[in-house]
Amino acid sequence: MQIRGIQSLYFSPTGGTAKYAKAMAAGAAEALACPAEVSSFTLPREREEERHFSSDELLIIGSPTYAGKLPNKILPEFQEKLRGEHTPVLLFVSYGNRNFDNSLAELLSVLRTNGFLPLAAAAFACRHAFSDRICPERPRVEELAEARGFAMRAAEALKAADPAVLEAASLAFTVPGDTEAPYYVPKGEDGAPAKFLKAKPLTDLSKCLHCGACAAHCPMGSIDAADTSNVPGICIKCQACVRGCKQGAKYFEDAAFLSHVRMLEQNFAAPEKENLYLSAF
């Protein structure tokens, strides 16, 4: 099958998913000897337009896992803004070393419904957005190289495949997970459900330079750029503002949220999960 271009798209508030999207784009580009365009689907302005992909393009797409599924506030954007035309796709999710649960299956279902042909998939354990104590060094250089090699092999198989065989392989391709399963319920240190849906970041005004970086990084556009201590919009707890503030001025102090973070650190810092690779070929 002839592929004329590669598109690599990612939702990545804290950067781990983006690293894998770029590594796999490079591997596929080398295998197919064609250009790869890497683009973000993270910020509101990057999700405004509907994106169409043709049958002679390869799409690589990745998202982090939130509570065992795709981020619930971003799921409608994936469903409504991505359109394929029998477009082959390599999909992946990242997760913070607890479990990717049903996120990979959900992403595959969305893409298949929207006209894509899923051919390969992966799940990557990354540094947890909530804590530097969970997989702080991941993705490691060797893991990105491994992902690049995976994409290269998938692209080579795609190049050699007959279109009819390709479509049949895609229809038979499955990944672990249940798209109908509910979201994971976060737990606190005591094992009880931790309810922090309404938690929002606070600002240490003694550190804040009013540079606006936190507002610029927010994937929901929820932080007031004129007064960054004001968060009138929805917070998805992605930590983009916390990690994007070089002064360390953004933080969370919600008791239930912090209890959940401690539970994760106590139970999921080790052992580190292995990355998962799956292929239809």
Segments predicted by a language model, with ranges:
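FMN-binding flavodoxin-like domain, especially the glycine-rich phosphate-binding loop
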Residues: 1-8, 14-20, 24-44, 49-193, ...
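Short, flexible coil/turn micro-motifs enriched in small/turn-prone residues
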Residues: 10-11, 207
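Acidic, Ser/Thr-rich low-complexity intrinsically disordered segments
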Residues: 177-220
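Iron-sulfur cluster-binding cysteine motifs and their immediate structural context
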Residues: 203-204, 209-258
